[in-house]
Each structure stands twice: as structure tokens, then as C-alpha cells.
Amino acid sequence: MQFIASILAVPAVAYAVAIPDDNSATGASKGSTCATGAQVACCTTNSSNSDLLGNVVGGSCLLDNLSLLSLNSNCPAGNTFCCPSNSDGTLNINAQCIPISA
């Protein structure tokens, strides 16, 4: 019985992950919004360790829905940024990201 339940659970989890819900933010991005053309991202650089303006380059960041999968649904405090995105929805890895203050 547990085998059948686990077989049925895998597609359900894959379906839930494949359809991101833009209205339900989790982790450090709750209530955070970015300007048009930018998206919430979780970065490997803490904003306290970034340059004088508090910016990091987008290459060290992942979009929120991808980063939550790799970080077990939790972006560490101080690692949430607004990063400029390309027209196809991917991050512009050469542009600077701006920290989101909690």
C-alpha cells in the first residue's frame, strides 16, 4: 500500500512544482515586490557582503521559484534581491540586483 501511495505522490508533487503560483510567495520573498522588468530572486551573496550600493550581479542568483527547490523552500534572510529579467523571463546575469529589505 505504501508503494502505491508513493507512486501516486510523485506525479502530484511534480505537478505542484511545475505550476508556479505568482500570488503565493514563500520564504524571504513574502510580501516583496519588484519593479516592472525585475523578479524576486534568492542569491548566494548576502546583501551585507555586497558592494557599496548593496548590489550583487544576477549570475549569483536564482529566480525565487527555482531557488526554493534547491534551498528547501527557504531563502536565507538578507539573500533576497530584485533582479532585472530578460524578455523571456530569465535573469539578466550581467545586471546588478537590488536587495529587498525585510
UniProtKB/Swiss-Prot annotation:
Keyword Secreted among record annotations: yes
Knockout consequences: When the four class I hydrophobins (hcf-1 to -4) are partially silenced, approximately 10 times fewer conidia are produced an the germination efficiency of conidia is reduced by about 50%.
Keyword line: Cell wall, Conidiation, Disulfide bond, Glycoprotein, Secreted, Signal, Sporulation
Coiled coil regions, renumbered to chain: none
Superkingdom assignment: Eukaryota
Disulfide bridge map: 34-82, 42-75, 43-61, 83-97
Tissue and organ expression note: Expressed in conidia and aerial hyphae.
Regulation: induction: Expression is increased during sporulation. Expression is up-regulated by carbon starvation, but down-regulated by nitrogen starvation.
Glycosylation sites: 46, 65
N-terminal signal peptide: 1-16
Subcellular location: Secreted; Secreted, Cell wall
Quaternary structure, from the entry: Self-assembles to form functional amyloid fibrils called rodlets. Self-assembly into fibrillar rodlets occurs spontaneously at hydrophobic:hydrophilic interfaces and the rodlets further associate laterally to form amphipathic monolayers.
Similarity comment: family membership: Belongs to the fungal hydrophobin family.
Task performed by this protein: Aerial growth, conidiation, and dispersal of filamentous fungi in the environment rely upon a capability of their secreting small amphipathic proteins called hydrophobins (HPBs) with low sequence identity. Class I can self-assemble into an outermost layer of rodlet bundles on aerial cell surfaces, conferring cellular hydrophobicity that supports fungal growth, development and dispersal; whereas Class II form highly ordered films at water-air interfaces through intermolecular interactions but contribute nothing to the rodlet structure.
Protein name: Class I hydrophobin 3
Organism name: Passalora fulva
